[in-house]
Amino acid sequence: MPRMTDQAMKPIHVIGGGMAGSEATWQLVSQGVPVILHEMRGVKGTDAHHTDGLAELVCSNSFRSDDHRTNAVGLLHEEMRRLDSIILRQGDAARLPAGGALAVDRDVFSQAVTKELSEHPLVTISREEIPALPPEDWDSVIIATGPLTSESLSEAILKETGEGELAFFDAIAPVVYRDSVNTEKAWFQSRYDKGDTDAERKAYLNCPMDRDQYEAFIDALIAAEKTEFKEWEANTPYFDGCLPIEVMAERGRETLRHGPMKPVGLTNPHNPTVKPWAIVQLRQDNALGTLFNLVGFQTKMKYGAQGEVLRMIPGLEEARFARLGGIHRNTFLNSPKLLDAQLRLKSQPRLRFAGQLIGVEGYVESAAMGLLAGRYAAAERLGASLTPPPATTALGALIGHVTGGHLISGKGSFQPMNVNFGLFPPIEQPTVDADGNRIKGKAKTPARKAAMSARALSDLADWQAG
């Protein structure tokens, strides 16, 4: 790392003391770069937080699976540990019994992160709201204000980025792994064969239903257990534009087949003489073509119910879900359009964004983006450059998705994403295990994931060494 200059000693401002902001702060000061961390809690609260502690966990106390061999979020844990993440280090220290998951004592965890950062000689914590974009003399800023970004700052970001580039609700449709769809029942075709290329004319996977299947599906949708909006979500005025599929079903049994499930402009090559009563369409969700989302299927069904109901769709009986659906109060940017590969706002490169605000979902994913934002900003301040982590790593796959790997297909197409193996470049399927035995059947999937994880950690080590 180059010798620190006077410019390097100028502090970097981090706005937001949640998971991403706390991690970004730690990564910066670990490189010798001073930080002013701005956190409004303690002066102004939010509708969901209960304390003024840094890295407060407002929902679950789980960081999800800690299995780094066959689980993508577990792999992300391991990568972050190897990069000296304060969130993972203090998470491990506050660990509770949770089987293969990493669950933490939320109070112990938040208090430990707060103590470590507040006592660090290079950290200044400023308890104040930043109600607008930072002043021009703040030449390097990381904005990590999360899903409950204050109204005034949200308005300032909206003004800078343009109408429609900042969302206030996510409307998440379920996403399935392409290789788990039964193409003996489903087929590729765009409505009315629209498109200039063969790929465009076959851009959608179509799952047909006859009348009995459709009626049973509607019954299941209406009967399924739903999650209720929290009071602070229900009172947010941006919800009307993204109705859950079950609400559409409740408004009329024919509503869906005249909406997202309309069976027009499509012919089933498996049964061309029979017109489907309804059709569920899946659209490619990432550039690799490994993930497909269910078009128009944002939902408030509980996760367990989603699996049961959605596997009633012909062709999805054995579907594996990379992401289940949901609708939540959220604030996030259209990052693939607005941010560069180093998380800088293209229109104002002095501003970096991190955490849920850039369109990742989950505590660990948010902290991971804070980790990268902090490292990028530190390198820049110190006159160095930092190449992005390889796309084969969990960190690289996730940042690649939010800054360019997602396919932009119209307003609202970019929605928050958890880390999952569908974001990674494919790998050749292992054929034998460590003992030389042939890998068969259900053992193939964990073997492929283990190979992806091994590749990721090897490539991460090379990136660190470089």
Curated annotation (Swiss-Prot):
It catalyses: uridine(54) in tRNA + (6R)-5,10-methylene-5,6,7,8-tetrahydrofolate + NADH + H(+) = 5-methyluridine(54) in tRNA + (6S)-5,6,7,8-tetrahydrofolate + NAD(+); uridine(54) in tRNA + (6R)-5,10-methylene-5,6,7,8-tetrahydrofolate + NADPH + H(+) = 5-methyluridine(54) in tRNA + (6S)-5,6,7,8-tetrahydrofolate + NADP(+). It is found in: Cytoplasm. It is an enzyme of class 2 (transferase). InterPro entries: FAD/NAD-bd_sf, MnmG-rel, MnmG-rel_CS, MnmG_N, TrmFO. Its EC number is 2.1.1.74. It holds the Pfam family GIDA. One of its GO terms (cellular component) is cytosol. FAD binds at residues 16-21. GO terms for biological process: tRNA methylation; tRNA wobble uridine modification. Keywords: Cytoplasm, FAD, Flavoprotein, Methyltransferase, NAD, NADP, Transferase, tRNA processing. One of its GO terms (molecular function) is tRNA (uracil(54)-C5)-methyltransferase activity, 5,10-methylenetetrahydrofolate-dependent. Its cofactor is FAD. Signal peptide: none annotated. The keyword tRNA processing applies. Catalyzes the folate-dependent formation of 5-methyl-uridine at position 54 (M-5-U54) in all tRNAs. Belongs to the MnmG family. TrmFO subfamily. This is Methylenetetrahydrofolate--tRNA-(uracil-5-)-methyltransferase TrmFO. It comes from Maricaulis maris (strain MCS10) (Caulobacter maris).
